[in-house]
Amino acid sequence: MDRLVKTEFNEVNLNFQKNQKCSSSFKLTNLMHTMSVAVSLTTTNPTTFSINKPLSVIPPLSSSTYTLHLTNLNQPPLSEPADVITVRTSMLPTGKATTDDLRRLFNKPGPHVFRDAVITVILVGPTVAEYVISNYETRNLFTKAISVCTKSNLTNLMKPAVESGKVEYVTDLITAGGDVNFRDSNGKSLIPFAIRTGKLAVLKLLVANGCRINDSVDFVLHEAAIIDRVDVVKFLFESFCDELDVNSVNREMMTPIHVSASEGHVSLIEFFVSIGGNANAVDSRRWTPLHHAASRNHLKAVEFLLENSDVKYARELNGKTAFEIASESGHTRLFGVLRWGDALLQAARVDDVHALKKCLGEGAEVNRKDQNGWTPLHWASFKGRIKSVKVLLEHGAEVDSVDDAGYTPLHCAAEAGHLQVALVLIAHGGCQTNLKSFQHVSPIATFQKHVSLHYSTKKSETFA
């Protein structure tokens, strides 16, 4: 005979409750027609699990019910592999035995003891499911845990599953009956929580199963701005185009561009601006996106916003410009673009060498361009400010920098008739003579009758 008893099931489900005594029952049946069977039940984790009748006797063709108890715990005692109950049996011709008799019987190894069954202990319920979401990647544990959950349990598990970014768990909950249109105590849908994970697959799964948003609460574009995901933003517009506004504001009156600027996410700022986002918008503190980028020392964001907004000198509620905000925080690398750049251009225009050197010493970018692509060297050359030209060149100014129309500083000097400036530029390598914007007319042609320039040009060619 292979075994003396049979189990009702190969698994026993134990619905775990945090910090409570938990129990579950299972049944064994004696297969012997005329003889009683002694039964020994042991668990792989006796400090956690106990059985009400670890040693017992089952009469012929009878059944006995046993109860598995779990001690008070604040988290489910999951293990891989799972804990089990081992069922050992032995024939008992006398039909009766004391506990000590049974203990001696099973303590003595031999062919009289059968290993009839192994019953797997399965921890189930919403508490177990939530614990698995946070701590395990094992889908089998999760599907078993939710097998006894109510629809309400399943729906409440949707948020932690979405927050985990584990698309398989979200799929299992939806399949089992979880409501994708769950809303938390603040009225938020599952969409913002999916966005925060950065898992586009979870987001697509929710949308495909009918999850809707209320953007007056969800602020999905703001959420996407935080994680710097243009692909997520594009998907949101594809899915909820009639419900989204690129200039929508959150409770602080910040637009998605404000948030992107605060995080320094230039690619998203560019995208939002490209679809109509207002780079000049102000929030509840009258901060522009430029104020936010400056406060967080995001140079690339500051540079982009300076080129795509008109708020360089805008003042917030306390009267501070973006430069003053950056200055208070000690973000010295922003000083050049937010302030010294303008001062540098002005100094170059008026030939204020002292101011020029001060700006450069404070960190102004020597090749910083204005709205027309003119560098300080363009301005100094055009104005004939030879002292400024020399200082700028000494500090690394690009002699052949090209503006938006294709002009170099040498072109500017030539058009304005500043011979000495042109000579200085040529001496520093400024000899671009064939730019398309001039229809192949060299700026040197402007001075071709000037003997000193002609000699200088020939001399440079001779020693080249």
From Swiss-Prot:
Any single Gene Ontology cellular-component annotation: nucleus
Entry keyword Ribosomal protein: no
Keyword line: ANK repeat, Cell membrane, Cytoplasm, Membrane, Nucleus, Repeat
Signal peptide residues on this chain, from the entry's feature table: none
ANK repeat feature ranges: 153-182, 186-215, 217-246, 252-281, 285-314, 318-347, 349-368, 372-401, 405-435
Main location: cytoplasm
Residue ranges constituting the MSP domain according to the UniProt record: 3-124
The keyword Repeat is assigned to this record: yes
Tissue and organ expression note: Expressed in roots.
Matches recorded under SMART domains: ANK (SM00248)
Top-level taxonomic group: Eukaryota
Membrane topology: Peripheral membrane protein
UniProt-listed InterPro entries: Ankyrin_rpt, Ankyrin_rpt-contain_sf, Ig-like_fold, MSP_dom, PapD-like_sf
Stored Pfam families: Ank_2
Subcellular localization: Cytoplasm; Nucleus; Cell membrane
Gene3D superfamilies: Ankyrin repeat-containing domain, Immunoglobulins
Function description: May be involved in arbuscular mycorrhizal (AM) symbiosis with AM fungi and in nitrogen-fixing rhizobial bacteria symbiosis leading to the formation of root nodules.
The protein's name: Protein VAPYRIN-LIKE
Upper taxonomic lineage: Eukaryota, Viridiplantae, Streptophyta, Embryophyta, Tracheophyta
UniProt gene name: VPYL
